[in-house]
């Protein structure tokens, strides 16, 4: 099987077509311009620097461009980085398209939509069910295409819906173990907690923050959406207030982006399973490319820790 970008080890030479996920111009200590590139294929992404760039290079090696690249995998501060030897734009004769380089969720969109719909169908509280169904219907096209984040966890096509499906399965297990849990409130919180990402982020390809993302953020966005849809459906009362609290508090702490800590049972569960699923996704991503008996590269989103891949099974 042909090796992909993250299959290469430090010291090996890469000769691949890759998609430029991001391209940022900088100035080196010697005063010369360079480009900081993030290059990706279906296996993931790596950073690279293109030194001594000309003005034409900014256009040739911008976001969403496909390039053919030769270079070496190096270790830079505990992380793999690509040192570029040669780079050129791909042409029509190369016969490559952007979709070939984009990581996607391991479950297809139709299966995820069916599973999420089943959880909504199981809700017994009519108000929570109506709000959840209406918001998901309003944004369903983007919801099943968007990543869950720009970086760190589930940052791939359909990553948002895959994150939600994984969390719904965790939520069901918790509710099965603890009968006091309000399933309807928990399921609604899981399905809606990151829905604001479809407004906060630009899309599944070369994802950036939108104006709303930079100035408001996905938590405030989804709470505003809940308020609007509740008004449209003539729903008011405690359910709406508590649902908004569950969504507002799902990051757990003020320093992590939540204006309130979790103050109801389901809010605390949502925070914990969100953190668990995101953390395990980040670990799996690096351990997948770590040999048994070795430590992974450092994971910035997990306190810059390296994780050990045990030899035994």
Curated annotation (Swiss-Prot):
Q: What is this protein called?
A: 3'-5' exoribonuclease YhaM
Keyword Nuclease listed? The answer is yes
Instruction: List the molecular function annotations (GO) for this entry.
Output: 3'-5'-RNA exonuclease activity; DNA binding
Q: What is its EC number?
A: 3.1.-.-
Q: Report the residue ranges that make up the HD domain in this protein.
A: 163-279
Q: Which residues bind DNA?
A: 22-90
Function (record text): Shows a 3'-5' exoribonuclease activity.
The family annotation for this protein states: Belongs to the YhaM family.
Q: Which InterPro entries match?
A: 3'-5'_exoribonuclease_YhaM, HD/PDEase_dom, HD_domain, NA-bd_OB-fold, NA-bd_OB_tRNA, YhaM_exoribonuc/phosphodiest
CDD domains found in the cross-reference section: HDc (cd00077), YhaM_OBF_like (cd04492)
| Pfam families on file | HD, tRNA_anti-codon
Q: What is the protein's species of origin? A: Listeria monocytogenes serotype 4b (strain F2365)
Which taxonomic lineage is given here? Answer: Bacteria, Bacillati, Bacillota, Bacilli, Bacillales
**PROSITE patterns attached here?**
HD (PS51831)
Q: List, in alphabetical order, the GO biological process terms annotated in this UniProt record.
A: rRNA 3'-end processing
Q: Which SUPFAM superfamilies match?
A: HD-domain/PDEase-like (SSF109604)
Q: What class of enzyme is it?
A: hydrolase
Q: List the disulfide bonds.
A: none
Keywords, sorted A to Z: DNA-binding, Exonuclease, Hydrolase, Nuclease
On the tree of life, the source organism's domain of life is Bacteria
């Amino acid at each position: 099987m042909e090796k992909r970008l993250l299959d290469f080890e430090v010291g090996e030479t890469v000769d691949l077509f890759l998609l430029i996920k991001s391209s940022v111009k900088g100035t080196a200590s010697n005063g010369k311009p360079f480009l900081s590139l993030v290059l990706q294929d279906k296996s993931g992404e790596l950073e690279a620097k293109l030194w001594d760039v000309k003005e034409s290079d900014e256009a040739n090696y911008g976001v969403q461009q496909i390039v053919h690249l030769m270079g070496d995998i190096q270790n830079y501060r505990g992380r793999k980085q690509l040192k570029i030897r040669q780079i050129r734009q791909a042409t029509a004769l190369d016969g490559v398209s952007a979709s070939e380089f984009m990581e996607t969720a391991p479950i297809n969109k139709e299966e995820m939509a069916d599973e999420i719909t089943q959880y909504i169908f199981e809700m017994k509280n009519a108000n929570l069910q109506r709000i959840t169904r209406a918001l998901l219907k309003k944004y369903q096209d983007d919801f099943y295409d968007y990543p869950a984040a720009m970086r760190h966890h589930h940052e791939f096509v359909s990553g948002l819906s895959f994150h939600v499906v994984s969390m719904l399965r965790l939520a069901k297990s918790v509710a099965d173990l603890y009968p006091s849990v309000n399933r309807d409130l928990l399921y609604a919180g899981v399905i809606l907690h990151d829905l604001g990402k479809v407004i906060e982020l630009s899309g599944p390809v070369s994802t950036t923050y939108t104006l709303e993302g930079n100035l408001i953020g996905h938590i405030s966005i989804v709470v505003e959406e809940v308020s609007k849809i509740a008004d449209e459906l003539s729903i008011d009362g405690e359910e709406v207030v508590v649902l908004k609290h569950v969504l507002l508090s799902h990051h757990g702490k003020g320093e992590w982006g939540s204006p309130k800590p979790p103050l109801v049972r389901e809010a605390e569960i949502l925070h914990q399973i969100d953190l668990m699923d995101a953390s395990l996704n980040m670990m799996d991503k690096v351990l997948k490319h770590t040999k048994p008996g070795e430590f992974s590269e450092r994971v910035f989103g997990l306190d810059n820790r390296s994780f050990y891949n045990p030899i035994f099974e």
